[in-house]
């Protein structure tokens, strides 16, 4: 590509669109982060940052967090709603509630809470969906508005703890997911002498589209039907506690890509709100739940990995619909609450790691088959001679398909014992030569060529063996085909010479990234600079801040990675605020009830039985170091 430029790199990896301005490519071809939007010229080179951490003893892979991105995401969402409220003359305020299930890491929750420390009236609360999460938010919510929303299934202990939260000075909304929870809440509130703040989760008929659409609709796991909601109202009236019902909640599902789905869901829920107000309920909070999407691929579309709207459009639609329907019913406008965790956290974290080796197709010269070879091999040689002689463009596809068919036949004949191993190897090499030659002759401008170009890019792609576990660090890429932006951290000032796929170091064939963000959408391979052990480069996996850490598992006993918190000072200096060591081998063994101390005793017994005395101390030391070591690969010398 003689016309390659930095702008071509930015467009090719679509960085400008998925990064929201937080990440970019410098004129030197290095990936940078701009964590503080107030100072966009203050950038950190991720490649140099990683090298500095390695020099300081932080082994790769390392998850790097940028708390200033969290601050910006919180404040930009609040600002979008504040502007919408002003635009439509809405008569109530907005509260952002962070559901800690998205990322419960202490640093993340504390930084989100700190993002509004300077505000006289913080627009921030916390959501819990389990007893452990509730215990956490009870100790943290006072750092913001002290509002806590309790979702999820509940037992008496959960409810009692939530009510104790009221005694601690919090404003705790207990959202009823099941009809049976009401009886428990009423009983525990009487025992504690605490008036509960109740919420209802409405099960809407409308169902948004997307990977998590089962969270909404009539068959959703959570929520109350219209009839059950009326039962709750009747029971509260009988107890003279209808004024305890203060919040209406619904959830369309995570990552709602289409703004029309959000608008339609809010419209239905708004009528629930107004009808309940007319029945005498004192509801004053309207909780739209999650659903605010993240544009992982930067296409601004309705795909599962994108969104066709921005923050202002999201806030405007919610506020506009509520304003109109409340005015129609002549009911007061409620406080708007959203639980937008993915939007807050996705961009703030990037996994940086090294490529430990590659496997690439190398062009090899082939000789014509022996005269007595099967006719099939002669047919393949003919395909090669035709293509190497620069066949007519119209014949390219036919020759390619013939070669593919011949290869399949050769493999079948080998399985039947009618081809030798050497003949099969020759057939495979001949096919690869044809594929390589065809790849160079096809044109993306020809629409009939494009499917074959994609097929050949995948077939001839280099394999990059990358020092990470897909199951630990990007579990959604494996579990639900979530797309995450991936790109080399340096060398992007030169045209990419290869296409590659990223394979992790687990012993699992599913440990492969098979979708990559591209300027045109999603591809099955990634354009990369040539890699070698003499001129290696690092890889970055972006937008991994939501759900990935807590969902990650220990397949092959690869544990948590090292992590670091990095910010940029007012003077532009990089500040590595803290480093948290990842799991050691002993740590992950303990998770599965294997005791490293017992193992050392066993090692000593085996060493004494089998190792010469002069070697014993060294061998035992290496075994002990192994137990204390990082679960990922470190030593390539």
UniProtKB/Swiss-Prot annotation:
Belongs to the Orn/Lys/Arg decarboxylase class-II family. SpeA subfamily. The keyword Kinase does not apply. This is Biosynthetic arginine decarboxylase. Its cofactor is Mg(2+); pyridoxal 5'-phosphate. It catalyses: L-arginine + H(+) = agmatine + CO2. Catalyzes the biosynthesis of agmatine from arginine. Its EC number is 4.1.1.19. Keywords: Decarboxylase, Lyase, Magnesium, Metal-binding, Polyamine biosynthesis, Pyridoxal phosphate, Spermidine biosynthesis. One of its GO terms (molecular function) is arginine decarboxylase activity. The keyword Zinc-finger does not apply. Coiled coil: none annotated. The modification N6-(pyridoxal phosphate)lysine is found at residue 101. CDD domains: PLPDE_III_ADC (cd06830). It comes from Shewanella sp. (strain ANA-3).
């Amino acid at each position: 590509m003689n016309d390659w430029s930095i702008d071509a790199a930015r467009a090719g990896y679509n960085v400008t669109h998925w990064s929201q301005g937080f990440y970019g490519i410098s004129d030197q071809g290095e990936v940078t982060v701009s964590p503080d939007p107030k100072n966009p010229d203050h950038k950190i080179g991720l490649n140099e940052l990683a090298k500095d951490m390695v020099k300081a003893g932080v082994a790769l892979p390392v998850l790097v967090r940028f708390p200033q991105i969290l601050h910006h995401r919180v404040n930009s969402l609040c600002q979008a709603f504040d502007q919408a409220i002003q635009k439509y003359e809405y008569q109530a305020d907005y509260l952002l509630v962070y559901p800690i299930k998205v990322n419960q890491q202490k640093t993340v929750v504390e930084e989100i809470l700190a993002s509004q420390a300077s505000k006289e009236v913080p627009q921030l609360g916390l959501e819990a969906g389990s007893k452990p999460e509730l215990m956490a938010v009870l100790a943290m919510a006072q750092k913001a508005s002290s509002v806590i929303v309790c979702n999820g299934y509940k037992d008496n202990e959960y409810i009692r703890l939530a009510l104790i939260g009221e005694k601690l000075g919090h404003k705790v909304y207990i959202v009823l997911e099941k009809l049976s929870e009401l009886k428990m809440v009423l009983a525990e509130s009487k025992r504690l002498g605490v008036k509960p703040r109740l919420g209802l989760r409405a099960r809407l008929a409308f169902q948004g589209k997307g990977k998590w659409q089962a969270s909404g609709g009539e068959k959703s796991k959570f929520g109350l039907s219209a009839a059950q909601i009326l039962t709750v109202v009747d029971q509260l009236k009988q107890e003279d506690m209808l004024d305890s019902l203060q919040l209406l909640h619904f959830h369309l599902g995570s990552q709602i890509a289409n703004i029309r789905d959000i608008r339609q869901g809010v419209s239905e829920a708004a009528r629930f709100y107004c009808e309940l107000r007319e029945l005498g309920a004192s509801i004053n909070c309207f909780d739209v739940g999650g659903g605010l999407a993240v544009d992982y691929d930067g296409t601004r579309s309705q795909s599962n990995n994108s969104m066709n709207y921005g923050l202002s459009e999201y806030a405007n639609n919610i506020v506009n619909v509520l304003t109109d329907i409340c005015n129609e019913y002549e009911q007061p406008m409620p406080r708007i609450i959203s639980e937008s965790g993915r939007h807050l956290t996705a961009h703030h974290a990037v996994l940086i790691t090294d490529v430990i080796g590659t496997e690439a197709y190398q062009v090899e010269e082939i000789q014509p088959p022996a005269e007595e070879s099967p006719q099939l091999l002669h047919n393949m040689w003919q395909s090669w001679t035709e293509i190497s002689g620069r066949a007519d463009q119209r014949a390219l596809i036919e020759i390619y398909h013939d070669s593919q068919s011949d290869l399949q036949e050769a493999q079948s004949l080998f399985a039947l014992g009618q081809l030798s191993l050497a003949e099969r190897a020759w057939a495979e090499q001949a096919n690869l030569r044809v594929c390589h030659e065809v790849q160079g002759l096809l044109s993306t401008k020809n629409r009939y060529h494009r499917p074959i170009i994609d097929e050949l890019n995948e077939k001839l792609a280099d394999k990059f063996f990358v020092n990470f576990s897909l199951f630990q660090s990007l579990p959604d890429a494996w579990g639900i085909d979530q797309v995450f932006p991936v790109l080399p951290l340096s060398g992007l000032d030169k045209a990419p010479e290869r296409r590659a796929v990223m394979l992790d170091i687990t012993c699992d064939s599913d440990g492969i990234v098979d979708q990559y963000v591209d300027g045109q959408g999603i591809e099955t391979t990634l354009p990369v600079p040539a890699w070698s052990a003499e001129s290696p480069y690092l890889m970055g996996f972006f937008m991994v801040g939501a759900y990935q850490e807590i969902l990650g598992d220990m397949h092959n006993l690869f544990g948590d990675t090292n992590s670091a918190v990095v910010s940029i000072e007012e003077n532009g200096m990089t500040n590595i605020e803290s480093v948290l060591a990842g799991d050691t081998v002993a740590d992950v063994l303990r998770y599965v009830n294997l005791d490293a101390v017992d193992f050392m005793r066993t090692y000593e017994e085996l060493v004494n039985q089998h190792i010469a005395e002069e070697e014993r101390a060294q061998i035992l030391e290496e075994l002990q170091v192994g137990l204390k070591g990082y679960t990922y690969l470190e030593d390539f010398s």
